[in-house]
Amino acid sequence: MRPKVVFVLGGPGAGKGTQCARIVEKYGYTHLSAGELLRDERKNPDSQYGELIEKYIKDGKIVPVEITISLLRREMDQTMAANAQKNKFLIDGFPRNQDNLQGWNKTMDGKADVSFVLFFDCNNEICIERCLERGKSSGRSDDNRESLEKRIQTYLQSTKPIIDLYEEMGKVKKIDASKSVDEVFDEVVKIFDKEG
């Protein structure tokens, strides 16, 4: 069985992680966060990629696509090997640019099906406020204003065009993410009840 994938996109602080946790609970998807996989890999002393990832993340740059895809693929393979029924994945924070998308299409063509793109649309200032709030407790080195402004720039320049591309293919489900967590999830539920 091929994995069924929903790409989850939106700026930093749009609430992707929070909503993904709820989707997992309600619909039995497996949540893969590209950023989390990279951060875990960076901490793994045996990783061949650790130092390289560290450098990219520190500079607020996007990690080379081969690394991200190999981590995503490894997780999907392991999940499905453990339980063949678990073939539905939310991939959060990927693809982040043209290079990511081309890498995915080249590597995963015929190996995974992208059902749709869940796009959490949120204004930048709200996103920044949320991240700064989160930074107080998350200990994430990139939850500071300077790093955030860089991340939002990167997102606008690189990820937004990807969303537009999927939009043309009729694959984008857009949600106003500036509302409360519950209101946003109500919208999410409408989409997943229809799309599965």
From Swiss-Prot:
Subunit structure: Monomer.
Compartments where located: Nucleus; Cytoplasm
Role description: Catalyzes the phosphorylation of pyrimidine nucleoside monophosphates at the expense of ATP. Plays an important role in de novo pyrimidine nucleotide biosynthesis. Has preference for UMP and CMP as phosphate acceptors. Also displays broad nucleoside diphosphate kinase activity.
Organism (species): Sus scrofa (Pig)
Binding annotation for ATP: 13-18, 134, 179
GO molecular function: (d)CMP kinase activity; ATP binding; CMP kinase activity; dCMP kinase activity; nucleoside diphosphate kinase activity; UMP kinase activity
Protein name, entry field: UMP-CMP kinase
Gene coding for it: CMPK1
Phosphoprotein among keywords: yes
The EC number(s) this enzyme carries: 2.7.4.14, 2.7.4.6
